[in-house]
A protein has these predicted regions:
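Juxtamembrane, membrane-proximal amphipathic segments and lipid-exposed surfaces
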Residues: 9-153
């Protein structure tokens, strides 16, 4: 039997359990995750059509997949994951993230933070609020990030 710990530790345990992650993901999709993912994918298509927005299009599609099925996944920097720089993690990625932040990132993060606060009001919504916090962080600076499964603890 596990010792009781902090709320964050409990949520991390839930995310590491594949069955609970799947159940929470299904609830997430039904309660708005599908619409959020479709919004991110639409933004990705718009960015791709402009050609100039191609670097951000990839990020929108990654975030869209993450926002569709967030439990059991986490966003990490590709440099930390691979141990080397690539186009999105070097100086061009930094410029891309600054431009993204100025144009759209902070608006999207505010939206996710507002949703997180609304979820935190209820006990049942706390796991969903934590997912909105994860999405707010990646929405601020998505270039150079990737989504990977949470490691079992």
């Amino acid at each position: 039997m596990r010792e009781s710990g902090s709320l964050c530790a409990e949520i991390a345990f839930l995310e590491a359990s594949p069955m609970l992650s799947s159940l929470l993901n299904v609830l997430w999709v039904v309660l708005g995750g599908l619409m959020m993912a479709l919004g991110w994918w639409l933004a990705g298509l718009i960015c791709a059509i402009t050609v100039v927005g191609l670097p951000w299009a990839r990020s929108c599609f990654v975030i869209g997949r993450f926002s569709l099925w967030p439990f059991g996944q986490e966003a990490v920097n590709r440099r930390d994951l691979r141990g080397r720089d690539d186009l999105g993690t070097g100086s061009l990625g930094l410029i891309g993230n600054v431009l993204w932040f100025l144009v759209a990132g902070w608006w999207l993060a505010i939206g996710h933070l507002s949703s997180a606060l609304a979820c935190f009001v209820t006990i049942v919504g706390i796991p969903f609020g934590i997912q909105h916090m994860k999405l707010a962080l990646i929405a601020l600076a998505p270039v150079g990030m990737t989504v990977v499964p949470v490691r079992n603890v």
